[in-house]
Amino acid sequence: MLGSLVLRRKALAPRLLLRLLRSPTLRGHGGASGRNVTTGSLGEPQWLRVATGGRPGTSPALFSGRGAATGGRQGGRFDTKCLAAATWGRLPGPEETLPGQDSWNGVPSRAGLGMCALAAALVVHCYSKSPSNKDAALLEAARANNMQEVSRLLSEGADVNAKHRLGWTALMVAAINRNNSVVQVLLAAGADPNLGDDFSSVYKTAKEQGIHSLEDGGQDGASRHITNQWTSALEFRRWLGLPAGVLITREDDFNNRLNNRASFKGCTALHYAVLADDYRTVKELLDGGANPLQRNEMGHTPLDYAREGEVMKLLRTSEAKYQEKQRKREAEERRRFPLEQRLKEHIIGQESAIATVGAAIRRKENGWYDEEHPLVFLFLGSSGIGKTELAKQTAKYMHKDAKKGFIRLDMSEFQERHEVAKFIGSPPGYVGHEEGGQLTKKLKQCPNAVVLFDEVDKAHPDVLTIMLQLFDEGRLTDGKGKTIDCKDAIFIMTSNVASDEIAQHALQLRQEALEMSRNRIAENLGDVQISDKITISKNFKENVIRPILKAHFRRDEFLGRINEIVYFLPFCHSELIQLVNKELNFWAKRAKQRHNITLLWDREVADVLVDGYNVHYGARSIKHEVERRVVNQLAAAYEQDLLPGGCTLRITVEDSDKQLLKSPELPSPQAEKRLPKLRLEIIDKDSKTRRLDIRAPLHPEKVCNTI
């Protein structure tokens, strides 16, 4: 078994052991005493014997009955010390003695050289059985173009997508070294050709991982001295898989022809195959599913690195085919799962707003839009009603969670005229000229981003002047005079202007619809749904909203560049029930995670909490109502030690107050004290319930301060 293990390592272990045993530096390293502390008279390295568990001058503990883990009662600590010294390249000195022994005289062992080599091979054998070492061996075999070794390691369970500790995979190693046969084996085994490299540059990677960029990391003074005198120490450490310098590791384990100062983060195997200018490997990767449009951290595709020739022609053809397949795949996905349906999963209500935004984006995705002008939206409505969330979900749909695809600017930070410089950058000669503007800098990175100008009504009117060119021609000139083309971007502005008028008009429309349904004497679910669907009239938009917007923004040309003005309406009763249940589910999940408490509630609880809705504050008023009437009780009960771990709680409405919920009329101010109250009940294991007696603290609104 040991022989086969060594042969599998290409006879590296025997050669290395011979170099260790025959090294003149080792035989001469004895200090002032002149004694050969490293080897005995038979050439036996005592430090290697101790590393395997034995004491100097004796048989190894592997065969003596004393375990290598303990090392005996006398030699345990020293054996561990020498084991660390052996693996880290530092040899024990003559001044280091065993407990209970005057000195280490280097008496040779009876076992001799063969026994020592056998023990060292056992150490290597134990190390090679770890799963991580199979992955490391796979990387080595891929670099050496050893197709048989790669196949064997994969059959033994090596991870085909395992990464080197510095970030690359075996497929990347094979691609950069033009090992086409290994690339075929790895792709057949399921290697992902679209994985990105985590290695950036030598110096940046060294800083991130805390390793020296040039020297061997983790050495102390003694081991560095040994490395300078005996070059095999570094080889021995690298053979055992111990940390080495980033530059040495990159050149030895990956490739030594790459620029060490360039950043390779995000590069795929296809990027590396193009850098190697290997036509066969590029074709294999493309046939194996590699994405020719994938960009690295620098924003470059494989085509950007291609030279003139067959590889460039192949990449251009593949890009066109891949784009066509991608368009068909995305179109099929949109048919099966429309944008409106995706948005409704995250936003409650606002069907009219979702339909308006979805229709505009559908025109853009299918090519039915003006390519010379960007899409511009203005979201109007009360606070806490879903305007910002709709913008976020639109960006998530367009850019698949890419952070650069969503740019948010809080326009309350641009209330002064001079703050235009923060928008596009300072002019030459002013502070911050080299840094660039907040908007222009981000649009350079992603010209087709979704840009949110939050609360645009709070910005200075002169700040909005620069948006005229942005919305009309889809370009913007920064403080350095450079033009950023962003015709493919989507610009969304949110505003609370005319929010009161919109809310009152919507409530009036709902009241009229409710009266119509009552006149029909048909209060069923269908009529409720009909009453929920209201539409803002054109007369209201032109005669009420338009004058308010013109008075605030002062420019017709600014309003004329807006493609769609989207109106967000107050929530109806059914939508408020959804908001309450969503908030209660949030606190039920939090109670389970933090306190192992199961939280339940009756259906009437949602009807009670809906009364806390304020049309001016939107969903935030529901959130605050749940915190006041439910979470406050939970916190007080927990503080008073009334909630045992693992219990089940139920939120109920007092029986004497449930009849108030059946009354269709709103309670008068005199009857405010008779509003339903929420109580907490604990459910025992026998399904019996008991009400919690919570000592209510002073209510903040009922505390009187005496002067």
UniProtKB/Swiss-Prot annotation:
GO terms for molecular function: ATP binding; ATP hydrolysis activity; ATP-dependent protein disaggregase activity. The record marks 126-127 as: Cleavage. It comes from the Eukaryota. It catalyses: ATP + H2O = ADP + phosphate + H(+). Changing residue 561 to G: In SCN9; decreased granulocyte differentiation; loss of ATP hydrolysis activity; loss of ATP-dependent protein disaggregase activity; decreased mitochondrial respiration. Changing residue 408 to G: In MGCA7B; decreased ATP hydrolysis activity; decreased ATP-dependent protein disaggregase activity; not changed mitochondrial respiration. Changing residue 560 to R: In MGCA7A; decreased ATP hydrolysis activity; decreased ATP-dependent protein disaggregase activity. Disaggregase activity is inhibited by ADP. GO terms for cellular component: cytoplasm; mitochondrial intermembrane space; mitochondrion. Widely expressed (at protein level). Expressed in fetal, as well as in adult tissues, with highest levels in adult brain, including thalamus, hippocampus, occipital cortex and parietal cortex. Low expression in granulocytes. Changing residue 561 to Q: In SCN9; decreased mitochondrial respiration. Keywords: Acetylation, ANK repeat, ATP-binding, Cataract, Disease variant, Epilepsy, Hydrolase, Intellectual disability, Mitochondrion, Nucleotide-binding, Repeat, Transit peptide. Proteolytically cleaved by protease PARL. ATP-dependent protein disaggregase activity is stimulated by PARL-mediated cleavage of the N-terminal autoinhibitory peptide. Residues 507-535 are annotated as: Regulatory. It is found in: Mitochondrion intermembrane space. The keyword Cell division does not apply. Residues 92-126 are annotated as: Autoinhibitory. It is linked to 3-methylglutaconic aciduria 7B: An autosomal recessive inborn error of metabolism with a highly variable phenotype. Primary disease symptoms are increased levels of 3-methylglutaconic acid, neurologic deterioration and neutropenia. Other common features include progressive encephalopathy, movement abnormalities, delayed psychomotor development,impaired intellectual development, cataracts, seizures, and recurrent infections. Hexamers display robustness and can tolerate some mutant subunits without loss of activity. Belongs to the ClpA/ClpB family. Homododecamer when substrate-bound; the homododecamer consists of 2 homohexamers stacked head-to-head via ANK repeat-mediated interactions. The active substrate-bound form is likely to exist in a dynamic equilibrium between homohexamers and homododecamers. Homotetradecamer in the unbound state which is remodeled upon substrate binding into the homododecamer. Interacts with PHB and PHB2. Interacts with MAVS; the interaction is enhanced by Sendai virus infection. This is Mitochondrial disaggregase. It comes from Homo sapiens. The gene is CLPB.
